[in-house]
Amino acid sequence: DGTHIKANANKNKRIKKQVKIITDKYHKELENEVNEFREMNGRDKYPSDDDDFGDGNYTIDEKTGEVKEVKNKNSKEITVSTVDPDAGLFVKGEHERQFAYTAQVACDKNGWALGFDLNPGNMHDSAAFLPFFDRLQPMYHASIWCADAGYANNLIAHHVQNNNCHLLVPYTRPKGATTTFSKREFDYYDEIDQYRCPNKKWLIPWNISKDGNIEYKIHKTDCGDCPFKKECLKNYSFKTVTRHLYEDCRLVANDFRLSEIGKTIYPMRKTTIERLFAVGKEQHGLRFTRFIGLEKNHNFLALLLACLNIKKLALLLVKRERKLKNKLTSIA
């Protein structure tokens, strides 16, 4: 699981900074598979997000004659703290923003902390998980990774299952507007890779987005005399259904969630990782940082989790000693 730790930085002392977007190796693998899919369907490859188009181009406004800079599409503007530049701006709620760090922590079924990672607060849990998983999996060879809904996406499910593990995540509601004829009303046929609509017409794969979402479209003539046209199409001329390239992996994770093992293991989160965070925040200062900089806070978190493991061991030894003492007393 991941938790945010408030940074020792004033949120009003900040500047705007332009940074280059760098594609990680996991999204590059997805990008390669997307381009392979496009080549199979006779389409050109997508340009890589890492292609360097320079620091920006300039254009002249024809009306005013003003020279304007065109921002590079492969860069984005972020908010950086002048007090702690390593921290990231975390959007806590609708109106609350603060500089923070996000900690990724893994524990076993008994609540022992096994590993951790610390990142800027503006990094989502799903983005921080994959390198964290690759570092811990060779050490512990876990067969099941149980996480909250923030880790429930197709890319994570694909990567975890490729490493011979199960991803156990909770149910998440479908995103988007509620419609009468949603995606679940369309039957998918894996053998021919096509969807069938309630009117028994076929939707064929038409295109694929850079994110890996395949678009299935129906011919306009098939929608012309459809009795469900008004409810199904709304303001569109033909129906489109999307399916991710790794959606099969997500369905496997969903089936594992509904299995007896999944129903038994998932409730253990509240007594393991959630309890670990609760004890750390309420009793040992995990809610706020005392240092400035990623390295110092990383070292503090390592010491804190080590102390929590030692505390857990000490309590178990005391408990065992009391049981032994009571047993000897009853015998005497």
List PLM regions with ranges.
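Anion-binding and metal-coordination hotspots
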Residues: 2-332
